[in-house]
Amino acid sequence: LTLWQADRSKPAIPFDRKTQIGLHHLALEVGTEAELNASAARIREWPGVTIEFEPEPLAGGPRKHMMFAEPGGIRLELIWTGTA
């Protein structure tokens, strides 16, 4: 994974997954449900972060996930697989 510094003299263009090739979001697995909830609590406090949704069941559970965007606009998903 390589992250590049953006040229701030040009306006940012929102990503459209239907018309552009690129990163839609990055999913990261957490080990336990408690870690997911603790991560959500920490993320809520970060300046500039937009939470798309708090931890919620995924496909009827027991898996849970949350989605948020970091200040640069990259969407991140944290997922607990329902085991451990």
Describe each model-derived feature in a short phrase.
Residues 1-20, 69, 75-80:
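Conserved short beta-strand elements that form part of the metal-binding/catalytic scaffold
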